[in-house]
From Swiss-Prot:
It is an enzyme of class 2 (transferase). Pfam families: CTP_transf_like. The keyword Cytoplasm applies. Pathway: Cofactor biosynthesis; coenzyme A biosynthesis; CoA from (R)-pantothenate: step 4/5. Belongs to the bacterial CoaD family. The keyword Cytoplasm applies. Substrate binds at residues 9, 41, 73, 87. Homohexamer. This is Phosphopantetheine adenylyltransferase. Its cofactor is Mg(2+).
Length: 162
């Protein structure tokens, strides 16, 4: 069984992430969404909240599971019996960053391959950082995130402001 992992922080998950998840799910027998703890990043949502939002977002995709993880991605891939990492590339800056990561992953686990997918055109500009910034400054984000995520972001931002 070909198992792939799509790792990320997903803070929050965007329509761009979900588009990539749906496309990758068609390519593999099983796709594991690896939600990284990322202690070095200040996140809007906790790891458990991000996992829950992704599970709610992906509930219609039977071959997709969502798992939180901390530590090295290559160790998580080994735990999940995954042989492929799926990564999204929006810009040349993404490519440079991902190329460095892929080189390190190959050193740590040579049998782990990376598959890079470019976003659908309507999502090429979209990032979690932009969504958070727009939401924090009172902008409307409904068109950029799944419905359950929109509600959660609005509630979280409102709670921070109170």
């Amino acid at each position: 069984m070909k198992i792939a992992i799509y790792p990320g922080t997903f803070d929050p998950v965007t329509n761009g992430h979900y588009d990539l998840i749906k496309r990758a799910a068609c390519m593999f027998e099983k796709l594991v969404i690896g939600v990284a703890e990322s202690p070095s990043k200040a996140t809007l949502f906790s790891l458990d909240e991000r996992v829950a939002l992704l599970r709610e977002t992906c509930y219609e995709l039977p071959n997709v599971s969502v798992e939180g993880f901390s530590g090295l991605l290559v160790d998580f891939a080994t735990e999940q019996n995954a042989s492929i990492l799926v990564r999204g590339l929006r810009t040349t800056m993404d490519f440079e960053y991902e190329f460095g990561l892929t080189t390190m992953y190959r050193r740590l686990k040579p049998e782990l391959e990376s598959l890079f997918l470019t976003p659908s055109e309507e999502f090429a500009f979209l990032s979690s950082t932009l969504v958070r910034e727009v939401a924090i400054h009172g902008g409307e984000i409904e068109q950029f995130v799944p419905g359950c995520v929109h509600q959660a972001v609005v509630a979280k931002v409102k709670a921070f402001k109170n």
